[in-house]
Each structure stands twice: as structure tokens, then as C-alpha cells.
A protein has these predicted regions:
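Conserved catalytic or regulatory cores that recognize and/or transform ribose-phosphate-containing ligands
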Residues: 1-140
Length: 140
């Protein structure tokens, strides 16, 4: 299944070189649609509209600021599933739980790629024959 993936980040980082370019070069767009909110393609679209059209959100918390926190609140209000990432050198990394740490942009892209692949596999399993396995019933 093709996912619409919203990429959320702070403007305090070089997001074009640290996030956008590496993700595009990895080829995540061939099977999915990346929504890069600060790219020319989406510059005239409201963030809320972009979030509504997304299936999941990838959020890099590195050097987070008030605008990023506002974006996160908006995504939460829209009940979007958010996967959080942070650079292991970020001074605030210990403030967060359930977060993917990365060491450099290659590590970030690989972890995002692995996450997306695992989500796509889960979706394939769930949609196969429209049969959902919720658990096993043990009858003695």
C-alpha cells in the first residue's frame, strides 16, 4: 500500500540537506508519497491540509522549536500516528520516550526506510484476504 508520509522537522536544522535530499535519494518516493512541507511543491498549501492528507507523520525533534511543537499538536488533534526521531547529539534527547535515535543523516534515512518497510509489510498482512487475526483462543 502506498503511504502518504508527512515529514515534520524544525527549521533550525539544514532540513534540505539533512532530511529532504537524503530521503529523496533513498527512493522512498517510488513506493510512497513524501509530503515535504517546506518544499516548493507544498509552499502554498496550509500545513493542516497536508497533515489531513497524510497517513503517518515522521517527526525529527532535533533542535525543536515552538513551530514544530505547534505542528505536533495539530497532528495529534487530527489523530495522526507520529513516529519520533532525534539526533543522538541533541541535548534534549533524554526528554523523550519511544523515540528513534540516529547518529547521522544516513542512519536517519535507513531507520525511516526500515520503519516504512515494516509498516508496509504489516499493511499487506492485514489486508491479505481481509482476514484479521487478533489473537489465539486457548480452549482447554
Amino acid at each position: 500500500m502506498k503511504l502518504n508520509i508527512y515529514i515534520m522537522h524544525s527549521e533550525k536544522i539544514d532540513y534540505k540537506e539533512e532530511i529532504y535530499r537524503p530521503l529523496l535519494e533513498k527512493g522512498l518516493m517510488k513506493d510512497n508519497t513524501l509530503i515535504l512541507p517546506l518544499s516548493k511543491k507544498f509552499e502554498s498549501t496550509y500545513i493542516k491540509e497536508l497533515l489531513i492528507s497524510s497517513d503517518i507523520v515522521i517527526c525529527d525533534l532535533t533542535k525543536s522549536n515552538i513551530f514544530l511543537k505547534t505542528e505536533i499538536k495539530m497532528a495529534n488533534k487530527l489523530n495522526k500516528k507520529i513516529y519520533y526521531f532525534i539526533n543522538s547529539n541533541d541535548k534534549n534527547k533524554n526528554k523523550y520516550k519511544d523515540i528513534f535515535e540516529y547518529t547521522n543523516k544516513e542512519d536517519f534515512v535507513n531507520k525511516v526506510d526500515n520503519l516504512i518497510n515494516s509498516l508496509n509489510k504489516k499493511e499487506l498482512i492485514l489486508n491479505r484476504d481481509n482476514i484479521y487475526t487478533l489473537g489465539k483462543l486457548n480452549i482447554d
